[in-house]
Amino acid sequence: MFLAINEMKHSKLRYALVIGVVFLIAYLVFFLTGLAYGLAQENRTAVDKWQADRILLSDEANGKLNMSMLTMDDYESVKAEDKAALAQFPGIVYQKGKKNQQIDVSFFGIEADEFLAPNLVKGRMFKNTGEVVVNDSLAKEDGLQVGDQLKVAGSKQTLKIVGFTDEAMYNVAPVIYMSLADFQEIRFNQALPKEAQKINAIVVRGQTKQVADNLENQPDSYK
């Protein structure tokens, strides 16, 4: 011990550099851990809010939400304590008149009276054609407000913001909630009757009593 202390006294610069390197490595690990956790949260906060017990996808989707395609007949075939239809699609929007300021988003098509409907921190739930509720990051980072209109890239559809929710991110993109009917127009460029609408998943709370053979069970840890 005496020799070690004596060596450190005579080589202060060398040991200071060693301590500095160890500190920088520890800081880098801390920084990367925080970054990874933040990205993981932004990848699925909207999903966590569902508090779902099961997410049913098509059996050919390989567990991927955006690759799943279901019909309303599939939805009706599921017998469960509580269920909700979900349609999802990534997209790009921009404020009307500001096409150069494009924003990556994730569209969620839902029914406003089902449990997938988001909590509101401002405004109201959508109820008319073209109305949407969006994550509040679009207000904080992009300056959007209730009443603003959004254009959808690749579509003639115009969306009107009527409410804001919080902690609604999916695949590191803010979520825009809309009716299933509006979603069909954006996704398929046509209005579809209720019975012909396409969805990506059936989200279940509680016990699932009956599931068709073409559906695949995903646990609540779905990412």
Task: Kindly give the residue locations of the regions a language model identified.
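Membrane-proximal extracellular/periplasmic loop immediately following the first transmembrane helix
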Residues: T45-Y94, D104-S106, Q210-N214
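Extracytoplasmic
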Residues: Q51, N100-V105, F115, T129, ...
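Solvent-exposed, non-transmembrane alpha-helical starts
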Residues: L65-M69, D104, A117, N128, ...
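The feature marks short, hydrophobic/small-residue-biased sequence motifs that occur predominantly
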Residues: Y75, A80-K127, Y177-L180
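Short, solvent-exposed hinge/capping segments at secondary-structure junctions
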Residues: I110-P118, V134-D148, F183-F188
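Mid-to-C-terminal secondary-structure elements
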Residues: S137-Y177
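Mechanotransmission and gating elements of multispan inner-membrane complexes involved in transport
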Residues: F164-K223
